[in-house]
Amino acid sequence: LLVRRLHRTERVVGIDRRRFPDKPKDVIHYQVDVRRKKTRDVFRTERVAAVVHLGVLHDPRVGERERHNWNIVAFQKLLDYIVEYEVKKLVVLSSAAVYGPHADNPQFLAEDAPLLGAQGFGAIRDLIELDMLAQSFFWRHPDTETVILRPCHILGGVHNAASNYLRLERPVTVMGFDPMMQAIHELDVVRAIEHALRPGAKGIFNLRGPGEMPLSKIFRKLGTSPIPIPGALATTVLDRAFRYHLSSFPAPELDHLRYVCMVDGTRAREVLGFTPAYDLEQTIEAVVSPRA
């Protein structure tokens, strides 16, 4: 989605070990692992002006060692190339999940809130480590304008935990809990990245989305019928369903169905000039009818 917008006005070069068969004709795609030496050749020959890092591996089915190597080791190599070839802009797509859902969270979390989302979930531990590496890079290399974006739940055609969960016909909920949820349309995230690429933009920004809604109301909007289950049983049910490939929603995500993890988007609005274009109903509907 980002490439299809940027290539209209910019020269776009992609690096990914996966194929990109339907890329726009004017987009250059290098099918290489960022950790390989060939990546240095790309930076040397392409005169890179900005790097947008989207390559976080979230798949909880991937082994911890492989996931860590891809998420952390690859990102460290990327930072080395940015320094070596004096790239002037770095945009990192993190997540509001780094804050973690907790019973004592304030209603809205600011960018300086502690990153407490790693409890019992290796994929989030990696994301927090990556976020902190980007923060360290921001301070150590002021010549590169570094932007870290922390969006709330991204909804659309994307295959992430939130969208996968809301696409379930009979999603499990935790009995007695109905947390308020924030969501942002995947195309609004693309727009936020475009804002972050503007000269002068730097720092950490929460991406709040168009508003909040109780989880139960989201289900009503989608016409789905959740199955309320006691907390301890819900963990067991989801763990087994995930293990036997009956569900793509991992049990450690259950805390998002109990507690709030909502962010304050004031800084993105006032500094980046970003406001969502899609309202909350459009954002929720994008789970089943994503926009091109």
Label the model's feature ranges.
Residues 1-50:
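N-terminal Rossmann/SDR dinucleotide-binding element
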Residues 190-251, 265, 281, 285:
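Mid/C-terminal beta-alpha module of Rossmann-like enzyme folds, strongest
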Residues 104-148, 153, 173-175:
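Catalytic helix-loop patch of NAD(P)-dependent Rossmann-fold dehydrogenases
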Residues 32-73, 81-84, 101:
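NAD(P)H-binding glycine-rich loop region in Rossmannoid oxidoreductase-like domains
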